[in-house]
């Protein structure tokens, strides 16, 4: 069919060509048609790396009845095998437990004073079916306390920022640890839920996820307790 269109002795019937110039107008997909012409010129299939429109090109080859191109496309699909699915689920839960910590504060050489301060302990559980995204989460946060096992879909964190009033020695005695995010040059402490969820959101979007649900208040994203992301 394609050859007939280009032969000089093949004219379009006058009743199908109101302008009377006797030429065909090929109204097909331009991007796919470029690869068809390349195949006819080179005699081989030469597609760019990662070309993802083989189904469209196959339909065009079938329309033009180019059997060798159809065979080449079938061989290409067979060599690629079944494409890996990109669908994935990411779920982030975070909970805070405030507690009152009592300690003795030194006010002088022989003067101690009983004091207390509230310490917020955060616990987060990240569940992700995409290992690359989960690894990026680990890299973004590091691990304060929790599961260091590789390969599972869960990543758990537990941390607590040290209030200014709480002495460092008391903070360490309680076995508490902070959580940091970012690289060496832009490292910052994750001191609250909004900061944690903001980082989760950044990593999720970088890996192609979209926000699916927010709990408990969909209107208050960064102060939520649970975020669910999906990728199709």
Curated annotation (Swiss-Prot):
Record bears the keyword Cell cycle: yes
GO cellular component: cytoplasm
Domain characteristics, as noted in the entry: The BTB domain is required for growth-suppressing properties.
Assembly, per entry: Homopentamer. Interacts with KCTD6 and KCTD21; KCTD11 and KCTD6 or KCTD21 may associate in pentameric assemblies. Component of the BCR(KCTD11) E3 ubiquitin ligase complex, at least composed of CUL3 and KCTD11 and RBX1. Interacts (via BTB domain) with CUL3; initially a 4:4 stoichiometry has been reported, however, electron microscopy revealed pentameric states of the BTB domain.
Gene (name only): Kctd11
Organism expressing this protein natively: Mus musculus (Mouse)
Taxonomy, superkingdom: Eukaryota
Example of a GO biological process term: negative regulation of neuroblast proliferation
Name of the protein: BTB/POZ domain-containing protein KCTD11
